[in-house]
Curated annotation (Swiss-Prot):
Residues annotated as domain FAD-binding PCMH-type: 33-198
GO molecular function, one term: FAD binding
Protein name according to UniProt: UDP-N-acetylenolpyruvoylglucosamine reductase
Subcellular location field: Cytoplasm
Cofactor(s) needed by this chain: FAD
Pfam family, any one: MurB_C
InterPro entries found in the cross-reference section: FAD-bd_PCMH, FAD-bd_PCMH-like_sf, FAD-bd_PCMH_sub1, FAD-bd_PCMH_sub2, MurB, MurB_C, MurB_C_sf, Oxid_FAD_bind_N
EC number(s) on file: 1.3.1.98
Species of the source: Clostridium tetani (strain Massachusetts / E88)
């Protein structure tokens, strides 16, 4: 950590000590509740601070990773070398007519609730998605036949040179769990969503219906990262996993959920290694039984722990 000394001092000077942490356990920042320490964790409060941190990191050849709410993230037990930039303090949100302008760190569920309060429809599907708007836009998150591409108008992003770009819906190139943001290594700063005026009762009824569905069908009582695998073309991942006889299989406290086999859950004290072992078992078994490759929807980062 000594070689980071001047780098950390500069970060503290520009962001304040309350926004710079060292040796921070990532298990405290992910919905899976696993993950070793990151060397440095920063929580910028403005776009200028984001630009500064990225420029400063690049200038010092220090690798960095940008995260939102950590709800689609599996951090290995050895943690992360370099820097994690967490956008939780970029959380301002406002409404202009039928548009919602939300900074990257705002939770998607909060945006959905704000839309409902203002009789704006189109975001009911997102009421139970735990991620941030930045992460949701990057991955074109969706659920129950709805996805971000249906409501996005435009977005402010930071490109690799540190310039702020305003991208139209077309320029965002949103597809199934992908976008131009992901392909080009852009960073979402702000999303502008375009909704339509609806009936308050219908909006809340739909949110209630989807909430009940989630509670009934998903293992919300345990830490997880939501759907572990992307949907393979022509199949449903959960159905393949169940038909492979893998429901309930476990390594330590990591388990394929009995409630929904598309979820791998942490039943208590699972390590990232346990979860990765379950992922590998599922992938290998489904491949040998159905000749279908399952790719993870959850993002896996960091280093393995040295024994």
């Amino acid at each position: 950590m000594n070689h980071y000394k001047d780098f950390i001092s500069n970060l503290i000077e520009n962001l304040g000590s309350e926004n710079v942490k060292t040796n921070e356990l990532m298990k405290n920042h992910t919905s899976f509740k696993v993950g070793g320490p990151v060397d440095i964790l920063v929580t910028p409060e403005s776009y200028e601070q984001v630009q500064y941190v990225i420029k400063h990191s690049r200038g010092n050849n220090i690798p960095y990773f940008i995260m939102g709410n950590g709800s689609n993230l599996l951090v290995r037990d050895g943690g992360i070398r370099g820097l994690v930039i967490k956008f939780c303090k970029l959380n301002r949100i406002k409404i202009e007519d039928d548009k919602i302008i939300a900074q990257s760190g705002v939770l998607l569920s909060k945006v959905s609730n704000m839309a409902a309060k203002n009789n704006l429809e189109g975001l009911e599907f997102a009421s139970g998605i735990p991620g941030s708007i930045g992460g949701a836009l990057t991955m074109n998150a969706g659920a129950y036949n709805g996805e971000i591409s249906q409501v996005i108008d435009s977005a402010l992003v930071l490109d690799k040179s540190g310039e702020i770009l305003n991208l139209s819906k077309e320029e965002l190139e949103l597809g199934y769990r992908t976008s131009s943001i992901l392909k080009n290594g852009y960073v979402v700063l702000e999303a502008i969503l375009k909704l339509s005026l609806g009936d308050s009762k219908n909006i809340y009824d739909r949110i209630k219906e989807l909430t009940e569905k989630r509670k009934t069908k998903q293992p919300l009582e345990y830490p997880s990262a939501g759907s572990t695998f992307k949907r393979p073309q022509g199949y449903f991942a959960a159905k393949l996993i169940e038909e492979s006889g893998l429901k309930g299989i476990n390594v330590g406290d990591a388990e394929v959920s009995q409630k929904h086999s598309g979820f791998i859950i942490n039943k208590g004290n699972a390590s990232a290694k346990d979860i990765l072992n379950v992922i590998n078992i599922v992938q290998d078994t489904v491949k040998s039984k159905f000749d279908v490759e399952l790719h993870t929807e959850v993002l896996i980062i960091g280093e393995d722990k040295l024994n």
